Design a protein with these regions (language model features):
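Class I S-adenosyl-L-methionine-dependent methyltransferase catalytic core
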Residues: 1-187
């Protein structure tokens, strides 16, 4: 993969990010949870001004303020209780309960929306979570927050997942997709 680090757990395809950047043609892009740098690499190739932040570099989106405004934000947060990136208590994936996770995620999404320029786009890549037979449709909760004008929902197929390597007993059906929610801040 020419973007980011394909061995980084939770990495997304740079081709998705590139398609979004080529479609929306932003001047300033923010990725507040940049992980392995996929969005950074795409922006470098497309010659778009980029700002990347991440908890591993000392930026905590829940508690820290974002400096500047952006006309495109790509947000691919960690999911609750799936991948443990480290033991940092501020890592969303380490939230002890689903409700605490969703509360922190809502703070993040609200901050990002406020950081958007008028007419700007917030793209959120999010999947569903299954635990103990229950489905947690994260995308649906975000949509119900009504943070801006939802203009598109893209269903993205997932590849190279650890769940593909696992044998499940019973009638468990693994999740093989994520959603890209496209919100627009009205001009």
């Amino acid at each position: 993969m020419p973007y980011g680090d394909s061995s980084y757990r939770g990495n997304c395809s740079g081709y998705l990010v590139k398609d979004l950047i080529c479609h929306f043609r932003p001047a300033r892009v923010l990725d507040p949870m940049e992980g392995s740098g996929t969005t950074r690499d795409v922006c470098r190739e497309c010659k778009v001004q980029y700002t990347g932040m991440d908890l591993k570099n000392g930026f905590d989106l829940v508690n820290d303020e974002i400096k500047g405004t952006f006309d495109f934000i790509f947000f691919h947060p960690p999911y609750w209780d799936i991948i443990k990136y480290d033991g940092d208590q501020h890592d969303l994936s380490n939230s002890p309960t689903y409700d605490i996770f969703m509360g922190k995620l809502r703070i993040c999404v609200s901050k990002l929306y406020e950081t958007l320029e008028r007419g700007g786009t917030l793209a959120i890549l999010i999947g569903d979570k299954k635990k103990n037979g229950d489905l947690y449709p994260l995308f649906n909760e975000i949509i119900n927050w009504r943070i801006g004008r939802l203009t598109q929902i893209i269903i993205k197929e997932q590849h190279n997942m650890r769940s593909n390597e696992t044998s499940y007993s019973g009638s468990f059906i693994p999740i093989h997709h994520e959603y890209v929610l496209i919100f627009r801040k009205e001009a």
